[in-house]
Structure formats: C-alpha cells, structure tokens
C-alpha cells in the first residue's frame, strides 16, 4: 500500500510539473495578446490611465515603470511576463492556504487541486450559454488588477488565521506585520476583497470580545489595528475612483433595485458557477471537523462578497462596470481549490465497501469534469481568428 501511494504521488508530481509549465506558457501568450491589444481586455485602458498619471493602484506604478524602461513594446512583453510570474506566485500562495485548510491532504495533491481550480469555469445550462463575461467565473484574465490582488489574498487569509488562532496569547509580531503588509498590497491592487473581508473580521472580533468578556481585548485591538493601513488604501482608492476629477463626473454606491426576474437569473448564475463547491462543502466539508472554524471563516467571507455583488451597485460613469463583483470573483480560485481538495479528501478515505461513498465521489468527479471542460475551452480560445472576449 505504501509503495502504491508513493508511486501515485510521483505520478501526481510529474503531471503537476507538466501542467504548471503548460499553464504558464498559455497565460503568457494570453497576457501578451491583451497587452498588445490584439484581443479586447481592460489592459489597454489600464495602460492609458497609468501613462496619463491617473493613479488608482499599484498596477499604475508598475505599468509606468515597465514602459519607462525601454518603451511600449518592451513594456508589453515585460508586463505579460510579470503577470505570468504573478500567476505562479498565486498558485504557490493558494497551495500554502490549502495546506493550512486541509493539512491531511498531501502536498502533491494540494498543488494539483490548485492547478485544476485555475482551469474551472461555470457549467453550461440550456438558455444560459455565457461562459466568461456576465457569469460567476473567476478566471478573469482580462483584468490585471484582480489578478494581482488574487495572488495575495491567500496570504491574507492564512496570516489572519494564524493571528486569530493566537489571539488568546501574544500575537506573533512578524505574522502581524506580514498580515498588515499583505492586506495593504492586496487592497492597493484591488480594494474589493477588503470590502468583503473587513466586515467578517470585525464581526469575529466583536463576537470574541463578548464571548471572553474582554479578557483578550489587547490582542483583539492589535489584530484590528492590522486592518488600518488597508483601510487607508481603501479610502485613497475611493477618492481616486469616485471623485469628480477622475472622469469629469461623479459615481456613488447605492443598493441595487432587485426584481424577481433578475434574482432568478442571479441564482442560476451562481449555481452554475458553484456546483462543485456547494457539493463538496455539504458532502465532505462537514466531515472535516478539526478544520470547521477555518473553513467557516472562509465561507463567511465568500458569502459576504457574493451578497455585496448582489445588493450593491454604482451610479454615474462606473454604473456598468460591475465593480462589486470583483470581491467574490477574486475568491473563485480559492473556492475551487478548497472544493477540489475536499473531493480529494473524500477519495483518500477508505470506502470499506460503502457504495454510497463511491457514488458521492463519482458525482463529485463528474461535476469537476463539467467545470473543467468550460475552463479549458475558455483558456484555449485566445489567439484564434476572430476571437474576442466579449463574444462569450
């Protein structure tokens, strides 16, 4: 049995190495086509804003630095390589987080789960044919700011979890500083995650304060202070994006006007995108009793992000940008990494002749296959004749 497991682990490592190389090659090609404006994306607009000194995030400074080195063509190539390296960094940080969530899942299979999560897309249903835009699909290659922030989000969640689990004693200074810096960088690239994460963290701190009758108030205050730099970055982003100077007009946040038809469409959209995560969470997630608090915090953050996407919107020149969607979209690969990791954990547990467990595993694998088919199709299309993201 041990020899069989060792061989399976070796095969998994070899497959992961090949798949990682293929993904990096494909991503670099996609990013270059976008940077050079061969296929439609948000990147040319980001470049134009950055070169015009309309700064609204770290990506603006990165663009100006790369374009200032050796001109436009070098900048386009360099940015595509930086984005590709960022994808690899995001895979690594998400692997660390998944190992924290599911420590009994072997490292090779955790890496495979993260890779497959980057290939998943929403299921296609009759009458609901969209695959990329207008759906819950987190592999949003057309927007660089969410790609950069998404790579740091696993560090935010991991370091916060370590601080939260240390709150009964002295908080580790290096972990506290690392969390504050990571959350600041995430927010400077894209503030959407902070808007979803901060309310959950505040609720946890208030709940703990009441539960312990203020016995851990010092640690709770210190943990709350770690959010202040990112809160300042959020305020700066708000002033840059919503002030009249940015586009000659104003934009505001309001509650969305909900209709039964729109709510029905939204429910179908999220179900299409979350079939496997919902299935894995309710079949296997409840069995991970030792990780219940960790998984529960992440589920709460994702639920708040989805609620913000449903109930909040913008007016003015940003009315149709869908910027409150980015919070839950930036968590997409983390959601699917956890879902696939739970599916692998289901396969790790001996069935002992239990036909129901084998059936549950087979259903999960079928759901995963459906997500993978769409994700691979979307990833394969850029560069083909007549291709445009918005044809989805």
Language-model-detected regions and their locations in the chain:
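Start-transfer (signal-anchor) and selected internal transmembrane alpha helices
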Residues: 1-27, 104-112
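Short hydrophobic/aromatic helix or loop-helix immediately within or flanking a transmembrane segment
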Residues: 45-84
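Transmembrane-helix motifs of polytopic, lipid-linked glycan transferases
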Residues: 81-105, 155
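Membrane-interface micro-motifs in multi-pass membrane enzymes
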Residues: 109-161, 269, 322-331
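Short hydrophobic alpha-helices at membrane interfaces in multi-pass membrane enzymes
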Residues: 159-184
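Perimembrane helix-loop-helix junctions
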Residues: 170, 197-228, 254
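Membrane-interface alpha helices of multi-pass inner-membrane proteins
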Residues: 175-191, 197, 202
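Transmembrane helical bundles and short interhelical boundary loops of multi-pass, membrane-embedded
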Residues: 231-234, 239-392
């Amino acid at each position: 049995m041990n020899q069989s497991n060792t061989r399976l682990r070796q095969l998994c490592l070899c497959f992961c190495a090949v798949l990682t190389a293929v993904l990096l090659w494909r991503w670099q090609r996609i990013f270059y086509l976008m940077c050079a404006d061969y296929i439609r994306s948000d990147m040319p607009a980001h470049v134009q804003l950055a070169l015009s000194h309309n700064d609204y995030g770290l990506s603006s400074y990165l663009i100006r630095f790369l374009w200032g080195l050796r001109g436009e063509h070098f900048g386009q190539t360099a940015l595509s390589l930086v984005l590709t390296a960022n994808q690899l960094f995001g895979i690594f940080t998400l692997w660390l987080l998944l190992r924290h969530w599911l420590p009994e899942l072997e490292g090779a299979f955790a890496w495979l789960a993260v890779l497959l999560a980057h290939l998943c897309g929403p299921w296609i249903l009759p009458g609901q044919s969209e695959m990329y835009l207008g759906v819950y699909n987190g592999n949003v290659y057309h927007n660089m700011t969410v790609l950069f922030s998404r790579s740091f989000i696993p560090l935010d969640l991991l370091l916060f979890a370590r601080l939260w689990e240390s709150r009964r004693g002295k908080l580790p200074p290096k972990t506290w500083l690392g969390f504050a810096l990571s959350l600041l960088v995430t927010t400077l690239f894209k503030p959407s995650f902070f808007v979803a994460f901060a309310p959950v963290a505040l609720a946890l701190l208030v709940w703990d304060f009441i539960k312990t009758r203020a016995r851990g108030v010092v640690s709770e205050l210190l943990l709350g202070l770690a959010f202040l730099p990112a809160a300042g970055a959020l305020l700066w982003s708000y002033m840059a994006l919503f002030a009249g100077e940015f586009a000659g007009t104003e934009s505001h946040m309001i509650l969305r006007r909900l209709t039964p038809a729109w709510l029905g469409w939204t429910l179908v959209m999220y179900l299409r995108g979350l079939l496997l995560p919902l299935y894995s969470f309710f079949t296997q997630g409840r069995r991970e009793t030792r990780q219940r608090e960790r998984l529960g915090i992440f589920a709460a953050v994702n639920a708040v992000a989805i609620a913000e996407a449903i109930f909040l919107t913008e007016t003015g020149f940003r009315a149709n940008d869908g910027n409150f969607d980015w919070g839950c979209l930036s968590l997409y690969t983390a959601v699917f990494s956890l879902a696939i990791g739970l599916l692998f954990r289901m396969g790790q547990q001996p069935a002992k002749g239990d036909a129901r467990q084998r059936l549950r595993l087979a259903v999960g694998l079928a759901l995963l296959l459906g997500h993978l088919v769409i994700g691979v199709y979307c990833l394969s299309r850029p560069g083909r004749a007549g291709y445009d993201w918005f044809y989805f």
